[in-house]
Amino acid sequence: MNHTAELEKALTDLRHITGISMEIHAETEEEVTKALEQLKLLSSAYKEKYNKIHFLQSLMTDSIPTYNVYDRAARLHIAPEEPRILYLLETSHSLDEDISEILKNLFPSQSGAFRIPLTEASCAILCPVRSLADSSQETVHLTARMIVDTVNAEALARVRVSYSKTLHNLLDLSTAFRETSLALKVGKLFYSEQTVFPYNRLGIGRLIYRLPTSLCENFLHEIFGEEIPQALDEETTATVNKFLQNNL
């Protein structure tokens, strides 16, 4: 593709993204190259500023000033004050096309849900709550269970899902993300046999997870002395798990 064709394509892309029509008069190869770079930067900056998924990702990580949230949400046609639930999904390997397609079918854009990629192995789903029944703990838990079972059955992939409480404002999204992230970490560590982790049912695992490492090491030394075993036998492991399950 010659530079003139590339320039025309860049102008067309910019018009599709922004609705702005431009004409560029470049006579030399150097001018064309510079114009191409500027157009690509402009398209990229516009996508970043006006892309819904990028906006939600930034909200989840507290990367947008609070005073700017309502204005950005209005420009993107996202209701800032609407009850929603955040689900956090993590796979054992990577989120391939099969899993992405399953999630797309379970939570289509027309439903008002947003599928937000996070890492190669994880994504978030911001799901609207249409009624009081939809926000009940039982319904939310069943939805998380449905995600796990469907992905497991159709993509033959093991996934874990955590979920937040109902958030009523986009400003609460970062808190919900921290809740679900913690639930996933604590769940994997202390309740490895489970695949669904509610934000508010982490038991004693939440408390232990937040203890300083040095305090945990001191406790182990008190129990085992200087020689802390690298692995526990099956009976001891079963006993520890039973204690955790009963918050003892």
Q: How should these model regions be labeled?
A:
Residues S21, H25-S58:
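Short, charged amphipathic alpha-helical surface segments
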Residues E6, T66-L86, E90-L95, I102-L248:
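Cytosolic nucleotide-utilizing catalytic cores of signal-transduction proteins
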Residues T61-D62:
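Gly/Thr-rich phosphate-binding loop signature of adenosyl cofactor/nucleotide-binding cores
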